[in-house]
Amino acid sequence: MPPGGSGPGGCPRRPPALAGPLPPPPPPPPPPLLPLLPLLLLLLLGAAEGARVSSSLSTTHHVHHFHSKHGTVPIAINRMPFLTRGGHAGTTYIFGKGGALITYTWPPNDRPSTRMDRLAVGFSTHQRSAVLVRVDSASGLGDYLQLHIDQGTVGVIFNVGTDDITIDEPNAIVSDGKYHVVRFTRSGGNATLQVDSWPVNERYPAGNFDNERLAIARQRIPYRLGRVVDEWLLDKGRQLTIFNSQAAIKIGGRDQGRPFQGQVSGLYYNGLKVLALAAESDPNVRTEGHLRLVGEGPSVLLSAETTATTLLADMATTIMETTTTMATTTTRRGRSPTLRDSTTQNTDDLLVASAECPSDDEDLEECEPSTGGELILPIITEDSLDPPPVATRSPFVPPPPTFYPFLTGVGATQDTLPPPAARRPPSGGPCQAERDDSDCEEPIEASGFASGEVFDSSLPPTDDEDFYTTFPLVTDRTTLLSPRKPAPRPNLRTDGATGAPGVLFAPSAPAPNLPAGKMNHRDPLQPLLENPPLGPGAPTSFEPRRPPPLRPGVTSAPGFPHLPTANPTGPGERGPPGAVEVIRESSSTTGMVVGIVAAAALCILILLYAMYKYRNRDEGSYQVDQSRNYISNSAQSNGAVVKEKAPAAPKTPSKAKKNKDKEYYV
C-alpha cells in the first residue's frame, strides 16, 4: 500500500503528515519595546538628574557610613547662599557692650540626643576673644559644643563623652568687623569647619581610622554581636559618637565670662532658628542683657562692600548636609502621657531630632528605645526591692494540676501578645515611661528596637556601648507583662508558646501551654503558689509548694498575701540585688534528677522481686522432692507401716481391700 493510500477498512490518510519532514518553527517575534520604555525613561531621568546635581553640587566625601558609629562626614556643597536665601541673612540681633545672652531651652521631655550636628551662623565683630554659641547637655553628662573666637580666628571645641575635640580655621581672621559666615558639622567624633569661602577644614580624631573597612565589615556582623564588637572597639580607644540629651543653646557667651559684642544673624542649629524664635517671643527662649533686634534684613552695620563680599562668599562656600540619629520621642520621669504621640519640631527636612536616646548613647546607664520586632530576653529582670503599698496584680489561679501551665523558657511569641492597640494605652504614654512600679498601670514590654533588650525608662538615656554592661544578653523573642490591674479570674490561653522558665505572669496575661515534649507528667501536683487561692473555683485538694527562687517577683493582691516575690537579698538567692535571673536548666535538671531516682528505685524493686522469686522456687522444689520420696517409700513398706497410714481418707478403701484379700488367702 502506498504511504499516502488508505487501508482496506477506509481509514483516513494520516501517515503522510507524519512521514514528511516537519516545517521549521516560525522565528520568535521581536521583543516588544513597550516594557522597555519605563527603563529607558528612568535612565534618561537619572542622567539628567545627575548632570543637574553635578552642576550645582560637588561632593568632597561620598562615603556614607550608615552602619558605622563614626564614619566620615557626608558633605554636599550647595552653591545657593544659605544665610541669604530669599535675599536676606535672617533674623539679626546686636549684642551691646555690656554683653547679652539668648538661651533656648529644650523641654525636659524633648531633649534630643544626636549622632550628627550642624551649626551655621553669620556674625560681625571686632573682638579677638569671645564665645558665640554654646550647646550644653543635661546636668551631669558633660557633653557640649562651643563656637568661639580665639585670637581673631574661629574655632569649635566639643566633647561627646571621650575627650575634648578641637577644630579651627587659623587662616581666616574674623575680628575685622566684616560679616562672616561659619558652618560647622559633626558626625560622631569627626568634624568639619568652614569660614566664608575658605576650604573646608576636616578633623578626624585618633581612633577613627579604617572607618570604611569597619563600615563594610559591620554589615556582615550579626546584630546580636554588634554590642560585643562595640565593646571591643571602645576598649581599643574608639571615639564615642552621641551628643547626649542636649538641654540648652546659649548665644552671646555672657555665662562663660567671654561675652560677644557685635552682630549675629540667622543662627541655625539642627533645624532650629533660635534667633527667629527669640524674635517671635517663643516660650522656650529667654533673653537678657544689652540686646537689640535689628530685623530680618541686613544690619545697618553692614556696608555695601561688606554685603557684596558676603553674597560672593555665600555663593562660593558650602553647606554641609548632615543628618541626625533617627529616633522617636521618649517619655521620661514626670512626662505627661500625651507627649508620647507629639512630634518633635522639625524646620529642616534633613534633620530628625527627638528626645529618645539613640541606639548608642555612650555616657549613661540605661535607655528605652522604641519597641520593634527584634531581639528579646529569655532572662527577664524586674526590680522588686520596693513593692507597692497597694496591690497592683490579681493572684494567679491555676487550672487543675494536670494541665498546669507555667512558662518554660522557649520565649513568648506574637501569639501570646495582645495587639499593639491593646499594648499601648490611648493616651500614648507607655507605662514604663518614668514611673515606678507602684504607680504603673500600663504594660511593661520587654523589647528592643535596635538593641533588643529590656529597658527601664525611669533612667536617663544611654549609649549602646555601655548599655549591655547592666543587662543580660537577649534572644529573638518578645515578652509582654500584662497591665497590673486587678481581675477576678485569670484569662488563660492555651494556644501560644511559652515564656521564660519559672516566670509567673499576672492573671490577665495570656498563660500559654507547655510546648510538646516539655510537660512533666511525673510531677503534676506542684503549683507555683505559696498558698492556694481562696476564691471560688480554686483547687484546694493538693498541697502547693514554692518553686525555686529563680524568677522575678509578682506583687500579691489583697487577700493573697503569700504570692511569691523575688527577694534578691534573701538566702539562697544569686545575682545582684534587684535582678533575678531565670535559668533554663532548672526544669530539665529537676526532671533528670527525678528520672534518675525513679530508674534507680525501679531497678532495686526489680532486683528484690527477682531475688524473692528465686528463693521461693528453691523451697518449692525441695518440698516436691521430699513428698515424692515419701510416697515411694510408703509404697515399698510392709503391712505394719501401711496400717500406720490407715487414717488417710483416700487410702482407706484400697487398704481395706488388701486386708480383705489377705484374709481370704489365709
UniProtKB/Swiss-Prot annotation:
Q: Which InterPro entries match?
A: ConA-like_dom_sf, Laminin_G, Neurexin-like, Neurexin-related_CASP
Question: Would you tell me the protein name for this molecule?
Answer: Neurexin-2-beta
Give the Gly residues compositional bias ranges.
1-10
This protein's UniProt keywords: Calcium, Cell adhesion, Cell membrane, Cell projection, Glycoprotein, Heparan sulfate, Membrane, Metal-binding, Proteoglycan, Repeat, Signal, Synapse, Transmembrane, Transmembrane helix
The residue ranges for the Extracellular side of the membrane come to 51-590
Assembly and partners?
Interacts (via cytoplasmic C-terminal region) with CASK. Specific isoforms bind alpha-dystroglycan and neuroligins NLGN1, NLGN2 and NLGN3. Interacts with CBLN1, CBLN2 and, less avidly, with CBLN4. Interacts with CLSTN3.
Residue intervals of the Laminin G-like domain: 91-299
PTM per UniProt?
O-glycosylated; contains heparan sulfate. Heparan sulfate attachment is required for synapse development by mediating interactions with neuroligins.
The way this protein sits in the membrane is described as:
Single-pass type I membrane protein
Positions with a binding annotation for Ca(2+) = 143, 160, 242, 244
Quote a single Gene Ontology cellular component term: plasma membrane
Q: Which family does it belong to?
A: Belongs to the neurexin family.
Q: Origin organism of this chain?
A: Homo sapiens
Q: Which Pfam families match?
A: Laminin_G_2
Molecular functions (GO terms): cell adhesion molecule binding; metal ion binding; neuroligin family protein binding; transmembrane signaling receptor activity
Q: Which SUPFAM superfamilies match?
A: Concanavalin A-like lectins/glucanases (SSF49899)
Write out the function statement from the record: Neuronal cell surface protein that may be involved in cell recognition and cell adhesion.
Instruction: Specify residue ranges for compositional bias: Pro residues.
Output: 21-30
